[in-house]
Amino acid sequence: MKIRQILSIGCFLWILASLRLAAQQPEIQPLPIDPKIRYGQLNNGLTYYIRHNAQPKDRADFFIAQNVGSILEDENQRGLAHFLEHMAFDGTKNFPGHGMDEFTESIGMRGGENFNAYTSFDETVYMIMNAPVTRESIVDSCLLILHDWSG
């Protein structure tokens, strides 16, 4: 009986101490945004971040991150987010069939290396990396691909 009382008091004190420590945790502050980044939110809810980089010269990276991943899948949907990620490379409204492949190859880029995506627990990210932006039409096409990927 005495051991049970001692254990009960010990557990109570441990819980009390844990709650006190949890209450003392400082509030997590958001990371500061680099002042060189221009950002905002469009009327449709899309948040954008733009930063100029001088190196590598005449090259740019384009990303679109969607807040969807495997965590949102029901049991009968396992793998759906990853499957849809792959399907985005099989043609889009503005780049039907192998149109994206033809475009990226025409400007010296390769799928997998410069043109890729991944799906994780809570996000799906599409990437166009190290794109030669020597012509405005290339930038326009890269943004159009991101638009198509956004659904």
PLM regions and their residue ranges:
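Short low-complexity stretches enriched in small and charged residues
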Residues: 20-23, 38-41, 79-87
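Active-site-adjacent, His/Asp/Glu-enriched structural segments that form or flank metal-binding
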Residues: 56, 66-81, 85-151
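Mature N-terminal segment immediately following signal peptide/propeptide cleavage
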Residues: 26-65
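Generic marker of residues within folded, mature protein domains
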Residues: 13, 30, 54, 116-118
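Bacterial Sec-dependent N-terminal signal peptides
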Residues: 1-25
